[in-house]
């Protein structure tokens, strides 16, 4: 595996633009792809605004903002977006057929060392990989919303994902200043299943008269459950 320098993010929606911001801030030459030029323009504007907020909060300086924006380019041709990149992160809507179509097209265009990652929060990485000639290079990189704030990264190992790819993605995650959890491919992975368990327990408390639903909701907001779990245990709700 060559040293990773460039990243292509596929999809410029809420998650894609957040991932692109993290990637560019972390020093990677980053291409952000979407079929809609208007969405791309909006994404770049939002990323720049988020970086300005970071400056106001003294999280970064003007030079770091300028460098991040200089590393970020937009592309509305998928084949061009992935040419000679080291890592592809797909962040399109959660439809298996769409993801398989994209991975099939991308796998035919990228170099043999390129890692193909999906930001899916629940779809099978092994099933996504099945439509490619290189399932050993397909992995899950599940970022959490908003990606530039929530540092958790759930790395999902497919049935055929190589350990070298897992190790490389771990290192990428560290370079992106993420808090890492590595899981095997299973329905919902770890984060979504834990989120469901938390939600079910809240329902039981209401059913058993332990708390009223307003109280459960209020406590969840007060203690910021979705982020407290992430900070304390390395897990989070998405």
Enumerate the predicted regions with their spans.
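NAD(P)+-binding Rossmann beta1-loop-alpha1 motif at the extreme N-terminus of oxidoreductases
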Residues: 1-53, 57, 109
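Rossmann-fold NAD(P)-binding glycine/threonine-rich loop
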Residues: 101-152, 157-166, 170
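Amphipathic alpha-helical segments at domain termini/boundaries
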Residues: 21-25, 32, 66-87, 168-177, ...
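A short glycine-threonine-serine/GTX helix/turn-capping micro-motif
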Residues: 185-193, 228-229
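Internal alpha-helical scaffold of NAD(P)-dependent oxidoreductase catalytic cores
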Residues: 155-186, 196-224
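Rossmann-like NAD(P)-binding element
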Residues: 35, 39-42, 55-116, 122-124
